[in-house]
Amino acid sequence: MKPNDKVIIGRLARPYGLRGWIKVVSFTHPIDNLLNHPTWQIQHNNEWQPLKLQAGKLHEPFLVVKLENIDDPETAKHYTNDLIAIERGALGALKEGDYYWTDLIGLAVVNTHGIELGTVDSLIETGSNDVLVVRSKERERLIPYTSYTIQSIDLEKKIIVVEWDADF
């Protein structure tokens, strides 16, 4: 992964108010972490373009933002459902053994017996630990993201090894 690779951190939703503000669905945790990045890359009409964040505030369960040169609801409407990204280099460094969720999605999951369980489709945050949503052609599995269950993660080989019975 290169520092200039894009990481999707949210999606523009719909216009909010009369001055060009836009509701945002944040993929970050906490959701207002997205506001820590002053320039976003917006995928508009299948092309990435930089837009500067002028202001933003929490309006649970959404954020609302004001982006540069978007000053009315008609202009804001053109950006509905556009993806928001930042460059990977703008993300903070992680401690050894920590991962961004975006890096785990799409990885193959096998158990310690070498049985393929599927691929990581998404993650769920729960009160006690995160959960991997692992999908295969046959089924969906919810695998706890704990130190006992997760045996190893290899981002280069794109594989997660888990201590998990294939029948669960």
Swiss-Prot record:
Subcellular localization: Cytoplasm
UniProt keyword list: Chaperone, Cytoplasm, Ribosome biogenesis, rRNA processing
Keyword Chaperone: yes
Residue stretches making up the PRC barrel domain: 96-168
GO biological process, alphabetically ordered: ribosomal small subunit biogenesis; rRNA processing
Main location: cytoplasm
Keyword Chaperone part of the UniProt annotation: yes
A single cellular component GO annotation: ribosome
Coiled-coil spans in chain: none
InterPro entries hit by this protein: PRC_barrel-like_sf (IPR011033), PRC_RimM (IPR056792), RimM (IPR011961), RimM_N (IPR002676), RimM_N_sf (IPR036976), Transl_B-barrel_sf (IPR009000)
A molecular function GO annotation: ribosome binding
Pfam families, per database record: PRC_RimM, RimM
Domain notes: The PRC barrel domain binds ribosomal protein uS19.
PANTHER family reported for this sequence: RIBOSOME MATURATION FACTOR RIMM
Subunit structure: Binds ribosomal protein uS19.
Protein family membership: Belongs to the RimM family.
Listed HAMAP family: Ribosome_mat_RimM (MF_00014)
Task of the protein: An accessory protein needed during the final step in the assembly of 30S ribosomal subunit, possibly for assembly of the head region. Essential for efficient processing of 16S rRNA. May be needed both before and after RbfA during the maturation of 16S rRNA. It has affinity for free ribosomal 30S subunits but not for 70S ribosomes.
Official protein name in the record: Ribosome maturation factor RimM
Organism in which the protein naturally occurs: Coxiella burnetii (strain Dugway 5J108-111)
